[in-house]
């Protein structure tokens, strides 16, 4: 049991930072990698009608990537990664219509004894912390954490994407209990508020205990070109997260807290949210459960509550089958729910 326990969480984080594995490689190389994930589901989104779908990304968003490393000697190496999302259910590119082609990561950089420095489009440290401390990891279909953060309603979600354009990412060297990252994104034009877009995280893991803190701040123009703003007059968002996890062998427990502050001309919005999750090894897989609750102050004080249960069965080192159910309720919307089964394969 110990051999397979919680493998999907580690796999999810590894897939989220797949290009970064090139940084730690010992020799010069170029590799092709990715994941294909499709599921069948009965889906009823908040406030909408039910539909039967064959959809991409039940447990992980499908993508392919090319990553490379050139050893420069003395502990230095040049690295790159180009990673594109796709939709295996219909052969489409991106996560959605209009998504940028290399939307996952697209960077070049240096790996040094002092850490890695990457320039381009980079996955945010905030997102990496969120994956590490929720049992559904990379699942945008079934993870309450990712649904609240990146599919927010009534203004409760994070602003922008989980990857930042025009950014510099620094990550400390591996090999210790601590890992930290800092990211800064520019607006790429004089006077752009987006030039002040920054964040970071720190993750500690030793034995069965792990913890993280993460922060990010985004600034946008009142009518931004790179943010689909649902709230007029939005200009700033600050987000902070703290989470802990403990692996008792028979069950791994995670707890997460998030605070969001939105600066809005018509009145600020402040949101407190928390998640409790568990993963229990059963057979050649695991039972997953997670619940997240969010309450805002301002703009009608909306509330959202979401819970999910699922079972992830490991067929091999690279392939798994899963079944999951999510229930979603939010102020001002009819309830939503999703039930689905799917298959995921990494390469």
Task: Indicate residue ranges for each PLM-predicted region.
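Gram-negative outer-membrane beta-barrel proteins
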Residues: 40-48, 86-92, 125-129, 188-190, ...
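Outer-membrane beta-barrel architecture
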Residues: 65-67, 107-109, 169-171, 201-203, ...
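Detector for outer-membrane/organellar transmembrane beta-barrel domains
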Residues: 198-308
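Outer membrane beta-barrel
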Residues: 27-43, 51-186, 194-196, 203-210
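Outer-membrane beta-barrel "beta-signal"
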Residues: 335-347
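Solvent-exposed loop/turn segments connecting transmembrane beta-strands
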Residues: 158-165, 186-196, 264-270, 297-304, ...
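Repeated loop/turn-to-beta-strand initiation elements of outer-membrane beta-barrel proteins
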Residues: 76-78, 114-117, 177-180, 208-213, ...
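N-terminal signal peptide c-region/cleavage motif recognized by signal peptidases
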Residues: 19-21
């Amino acid at each position: 049991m110990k051999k397979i326990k919680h493998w999907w969480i580690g796999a999810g984080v590894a897939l989220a930072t797949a290009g970064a594995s090139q940084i730690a490689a010992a020799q010069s190389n170029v590799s092709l990698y990715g994941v294909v994930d499709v599921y069948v589901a009965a889906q009823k989104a908040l406030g909408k009608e039910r539909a039967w779908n064959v959809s991409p990304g039940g447990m992980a968003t499908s993508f392919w990537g090319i990553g490379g490393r050139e050893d420069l000697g003395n502990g230095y190496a040049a690295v790159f990664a180009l990673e594109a999302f796709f939709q295996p259910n219909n052969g489409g590119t991106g996560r959605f219509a209009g998504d940028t082609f290399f939307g996952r990561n697209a960077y070049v950089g240096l790996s040094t004894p002092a850490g890695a420095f990457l320039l381009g489009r980079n996955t945010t440290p905030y997102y990496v912390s969120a994956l590490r401390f929720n049992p559904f990891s990379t699942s945008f279909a079934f993870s309450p954490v990712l649904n609240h953060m990146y599919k927010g309603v009534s203004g409760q979600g994070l602003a922008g994407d989980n990857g930042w354009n025009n950014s510099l990412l620094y990550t400390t060297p591996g090999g210790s209990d601590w890992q930290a990252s800092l990211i800064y994104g520019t607006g790429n034009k004089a006077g752009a508020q987006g030039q002040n877009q920054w964040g970071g995280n720190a993750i500690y893991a030793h034995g069965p205990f792990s913890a993280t803190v993460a922060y990010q701040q985004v600034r946008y123009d009142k009518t931004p070109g790179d943010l689909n703003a649902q709230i007029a007059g939005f200009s700033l968002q600050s987000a902070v997260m703290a989470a802990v996890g403990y692996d008792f062998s028979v069950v791994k427990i995670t707890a997460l807290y998030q605070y969001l502050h939105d600066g809005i001309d018509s009145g600020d919005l402040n949101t407190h949210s928390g998640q409790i999750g568990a993963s229990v090894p059963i057979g050649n897989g695991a039972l997953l459960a997670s619940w997240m609750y969010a309450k805002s102050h301002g703009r009608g004080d909306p509330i959202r509550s979401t819970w999910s249960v699922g079972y992830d069965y490991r067929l091999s080192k690279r392939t798994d089958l899963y079944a999951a159910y999510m229930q979603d309720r939010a102020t001002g919307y009819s309830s939503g729910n999703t039930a689905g089964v799917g298959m995921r394969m990494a390469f």
